Amino acid sequence: RAVDVDTLVLLLGMMLLAAYLTRAAFFRATAYYVLVHSKTPRGLLLALVMISGLLSAFLVNDTVCLMLTPLVLMLVKSADLPPLPYLLGLCMASNAGSVATFTGNPQNMIIGVASKIPYAQFIAYMALPALLSLLVVLAVLLFMFSKELPHRSIHPEGPPPPVDRRLMVICSIAVAGILVAFFAGLPLSWSALV
C-alpha cells in the first residue's frame, strides 16, 4: 500500500491539536516563560533545546519547528542575540526529541501503526536515546557557539502574551485524553483525531 490511511489520520490529528494550541497562544506563552526563566543566553539555549525536544516528542516535530521559529526569532532579536545557535538548536532538538514517541515524526507514525508496538513500550525503548541525543545537541552547540553566547543576563520585554484560557483548558484536556488513549493501547490514529 502506497498510502497508509491510519498514519495520515494520526498526522492530521496531531497537526490539528498543534493548530489549536497555537490559537490558544500556548507556543507564545511557552516562549515567554522560557525567556523569563532562562536568565542567560546559554540558559536560553538549554531551555530551547529541552522544550523543543519535549514538545517534538508529543507533537509532530515539523509542527513544533513551524510554530516556534518565529517566536525564537522574536526572542533572540529582543535579547540582542545571534539567531543561528537558537535556530539550529530548535531544528536539531526537534529531530532528536521526536524519536522518543510514535507521534514525534511521520516515520515513527508509520512504524507505530505498522508494528503494533504499544506506545508505552516504544517510549521505554526510545526515551533514553532521545534524551542523550538532546544532550549531544546542546553540547555541540555550546562548543560551536561559545564565543557568540555572551555571559550576561537577559530579560523579556513587555508583559506575558495573552492566552485564551478557555481554549487552553480544552487543549489540555484533549492532550491528556490523547496521551491516556495512547498509553492504554487504543488505535493511535483515531485517538489523535477524536
PLM regions with names:
Residues 1-16, 67, 167-178, 186-194:
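Hydrophobic mid-bilayer segments of alpha-helices in multi-pass membrane transport proteins
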Residues 2-84:
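Membrane-embedded alpha-helical segments and adjacent helix-loop junctions characteristic
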Residues 8-9, 42-50, 64, 87-88, ...:
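Hydrophobic alpha-helical transmembrane segments
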Residues 14-19, 39, 50-61, 92-101, ...:
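Helix-loop-helix module between adjacent transmembrane segments
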Residues 32-41, 156-167, 182-186:
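Short, amphipathic, aromatic/basic-enriched membrane-interface segments that mark the entry/exit
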Residues 50-54, 75, 139, 175-183:
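Alpha-helical transmembrane segments of multipass membrane proteins
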Residues 61-68, 72, 102-108, 188-190:
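Transmembrane helix boundary and interhelical junction motifs in multipass membrane proteins
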Residues 81, 88, 100-101, 120-163:
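Juxtamembrane and boundary regions of transmembrane helices in multi-pass small-molecule transporters
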